[in-house]
Amino acid sequence: QTMDEVDKDKIGAIGHSLGGHNTLFLGAFDERIKVMVTSCGFTSMKKYYNGDLTGWSHKGYMPRIKEQYQCNPNLLPFDFTEILGTLAPRPVFINAPLHDNNFEVSGVDDCVNSAQKIYALYKAEDNLKVVHPNCGHDFPPEIREEAYRFLDKHLGWTPE
């Protein structure tokens, strides 16, 4: 933002997998992020490996999930519904493949359906977009292109 070529009103973030959920966390904590794209980045905590949150809890990432909440999603004080809700009404594009073994698709839909109610309060339901390509843990080229168009549209950028 301190660089001349950065327009502080047109900052977006995009990430896949770990980068996908970190994009959502970034947006939740930094309102300068105006639009986000998450690819294969989350599912509901209860549906992440049948509720085993060990993958989230390693020492270099979120150790409190283990230390304080015993990797139990029922004890965790948040889920991705709340993360998505904090982003409203900002635009979020979600790539949630049908066969992602890491982030179960029905858990994504559970979170999105709940968060959509928050977006509705802002009359911004169209700002929460989900696609379900027929693939595994991947960000296929055609979905990437759709995500880039989403970013361009919401940041007001027209390719040259």
Model-derived segments and their meaning:
Residues G20-E31:
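Short glycine-enriched nucleophile-adjacent loop
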Residues I14, S39-C40, N95, P133:
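Alpha/beta-hydrolase-fold catalytic nucleophile elbow
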Residues A88-S106, P133-G136:
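Conserved strand-to-loop "acid loop" that flanks and positions the catalytic carboxylate
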Residues V112-E160:
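C-terminal catalytic histidine-bearing segment of alpha/beta-hydrolase fold enzymes
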Residues S17, F42, L98:
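Flexible, active-site-proximal loop/turn residues at the rims of small-molecule/cofactor binding pockets
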Residues K8-K10, E31-V35, A88-V92, D126:
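Loop/turn elements at helix/coil->beta-strand transitions in domains of secreted/extracellular proteins
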Residues T38-I83, P89, N102-V112, A120-A124:
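Mobile cap/lid helix-loop segments that gate and shape the active-site cleft of serine hydrolases
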Residues Q1-S17, I33:
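Gly/Ser-rich "nucleophile elbow"/oxyanion-hole loop immediately N-terminal to the catalytic nucleophile
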